[in-house]
C-alpha cells in the first residue's frame, strides 16, 4: 500500500486548525476539484459518520475512522481513481500547529493517481493543498 507523508506548519492554534480541517462546507477552499459534499449522516466528530465528497461528477464515499479533537482525524475514502485512508495529526509547535498528513492508497489505479498528486508542491498536489490549507488556517486565526 503506497504511503505519502506530508507536513506543514500553520501559525494558528490546534483547535482552530482542526476545526477548519473538518469543516466540510469549506473543503473546496484547499482541496482542488471538490464541488460539493453530500449525504452527511452525522457529525464529522463522530466515528462512523459517512459523507460523499464530489469531484465534479465523480463521487468519493468517505467514512470517519477517528476524530480526536484537536489532535487527530482519520477517514477512509474511495473513488474509482483514488481510494485509501487519510490520517492527519495536529500537534502544538511553538505558537502554532504542525500538521502531519499520512495518506495510504489502495489498489494499482490509486497508486498511479496518487503518485501524480504526490510529486512536488504545485497547486493541486498533496503538498500544495496542505500548504494552501495552512495559509488559510493562518488567515482565519488572524481574523480574516
Predicted segment positions?
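Hydrophobic ligand-binding cavity/cleft-lining segments
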Residues: 1-42, 138, 143-144
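Short, surface-exposed coil-to-beta transition loops
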Residues: 3-5, 58-62, 82-87
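Short, hydrophobic/aromatic-rich segments at coil-to-beta transitions
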Residues: 44-52, 67-75
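A generic structural motif
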Residues: 32, 59, 69-70
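Beta-strand/loop substructures that line and gate deep hydrophobic ligand-binding cavities in soluble
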Residues: 76-128, 133-135, 144
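A short, structured loop/turn motif at beta-sheet edges
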Residues: 11-15, 42, 65-70, 89-98, ...
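Helix-adjacent hinge/juxtasegments
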Residues: 57-66, 75-79
Amino acid at each position: 500500500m503506497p504511503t505519502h507523508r506530508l507536513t506543514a506548519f500553520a501559525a494558528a492554534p490546534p483547535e482552530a486548525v482542526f476545526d477548519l480541517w473538518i469543516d466540510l462546507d469549506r473543503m473546496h477552499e484547499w482541496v482542488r476539484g471538490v464541488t460539493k459534499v453530500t449525504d452527511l449522516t452525522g457529525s464529522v466528530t463522530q466515528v462512523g459518520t459517512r459523507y460523499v465528497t464530489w469531484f465534479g461528477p465523480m463521487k468519493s464515499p468517505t467514512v470517519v475512522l477517528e476524530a480526536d479533537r484537536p489532535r487527530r482525524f482519520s477517514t477512509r475514502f474511495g473513488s474509482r481513481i483514488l481510494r485509501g485512508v487519510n490520517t492527519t495529526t495536529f500537534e502544538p509547535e511553538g505558537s502554532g500547529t504542525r500538521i502531519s498528513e499520512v495518506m495510504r492508497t489502495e489498489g494499482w489505479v490509486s497508486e498511479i493517481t496518487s503518485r501524480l498528486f504526490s510529486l512536488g508542491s504545485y497547486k493541486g498536489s498533496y503538498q500544495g493543498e496542505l500548504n494552501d490549507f495552512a495559509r488559510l488556517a493562518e488567515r482565519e486565526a488572524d481574523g480574516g
